[in-house]
């Protein structure tokens, strides 16, 4: 086997600060995502006083809030949590697409990892499945991805 330097992130959140953006729209689903993210970070060493939850109206507002948080310099990582459920109009496509693009730009422009926990589903049932039932909890997954990315970036 070839021996090459490998950089991996450790799942240790001690001493790190995180902002969690949570939409109020579909809050009965988003609250489960938030609970999963907070629990994950706490179990991995992050103190609750080092987590800030920022409630916003909906997914479309995520990028501007993430940008402000990233520019503040107070957070090692940002976790964006929300749920956009497809309806009968193209509204879903516009909101989900713009939020996704905006969050990616914020992460790239600022250098602050932004975890993508925005559910984009065809039904309420699918959203519930991804908020802690059959398909796991995407809030946990977004928190884990941000934590690992923060720790990788410290080594680059």
UniProtKB/Swiss-Prot annotation:
Entries under InterPro entries matching the protein: LS, LS/RS, LS/RS_sf
Sections of the chain in a coiled coil: none
EC supergroup of this enzyme: transferase
Keyword Transferase: yes
An example molecular function term from Gene Ontology annotations: 6,7-dimethyl-8-ribityllumazine synthase activity
Pathway(s) per entry: Cofactor biosynthesis; riboflavin biosynthesis; riboflavin from 2-hydroxy-3-oxobutyl phosphate and 5-amino-6-(D-ribitylamino)uracil: step 1/2
Annotated active site: 91
List of residues binding 5-amino-6-(D-ribitylamino)uracil: 25, 59-61, 83-85, 116
UniProt binding sites for (2S)-2-hydroxy-3-oxobutyl phosphate: 88-89, 130
GO cellular component: cytosol; riboflavin synthase complex
Keywords on record: Riboflavin biosynthesis, Transferase
One Pfam family linked to the record: DMRL_synthase
KW Transferase (keyword) present: yes
EC number: 2.5.1.78
Alphabetical GO biological process terms: riboflavin biosynthetic process
Recorded catalytic activity of this chain's protein: (2S)-2-hydroxy-3-oxobutyl phosphate + 5-amino-6-(D-ribitylamino)uracil = 6,7-dimethyl-8-(1-D-ribityl)lumazine + phosphate + 2 H2O + H(+)
Taxonomy, superkingdom: Bacteria
PANTHER family (alphabetical): 6,7-DIMETHYL-8-RIBITYLLUMAZINE SYNTHASE, 6,7-DIMETHYL-8-RIBITYLLUMAZINE SYNTHASE DMRL SYNTHASE LUMAZINE SYNTHASE
Family: Belongs to the DMRL synthase family.
Job of this protein: Catalyzes the formation of 6,7-dimethyl-8-ribityllumazine by condensation of 5-amino-6-(D-ribitylamino)uracil with 3,4-dihydroxy-2-butanone 4-phosphate. This is the penultimate step in the biosynthesis of riboflavin.
Name this polypeptide is given: 6,7-dimethyl-8-ribityllumazine synthase
Organism whose genome encodes this protein: Nitratidesulfovibrio vulgaris (strain DSM 19637 / Miyazaki F)
């Amino acid at each position: 086997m070839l021996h090459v330097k490998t950089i991996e992130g450790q799942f240790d959140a001690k001493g790190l600060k995180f902002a969690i953006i949570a939409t109020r729209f579909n809050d009965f689903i988003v609250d489960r995502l938030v609970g999963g993210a907070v629990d994950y970070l706490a179990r991995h060493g992050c103190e609750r006083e080092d987590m800030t939850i920022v409630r916003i109206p909906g997914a479309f507002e995520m990028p501007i809030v993430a940008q402000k948080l990233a520019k503040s310099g107070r957070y090692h990582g940002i976790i964006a949590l929300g749920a956009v459920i497809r309806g009968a109009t193209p509204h879903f496509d516009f909101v989900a697409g713009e939020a996704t693009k905006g969050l990616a730009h914020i992460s790239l422009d600022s250098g602050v990892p932004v975890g993508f926990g925005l559910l984009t589903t065809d039904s309420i049932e699918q959203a519930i499945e991804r908020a802690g039932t059959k398909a796991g909890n995407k809030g946990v997954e977004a928190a884990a991805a941000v934590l690992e990315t923060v720790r990788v970036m410290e080594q680059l």
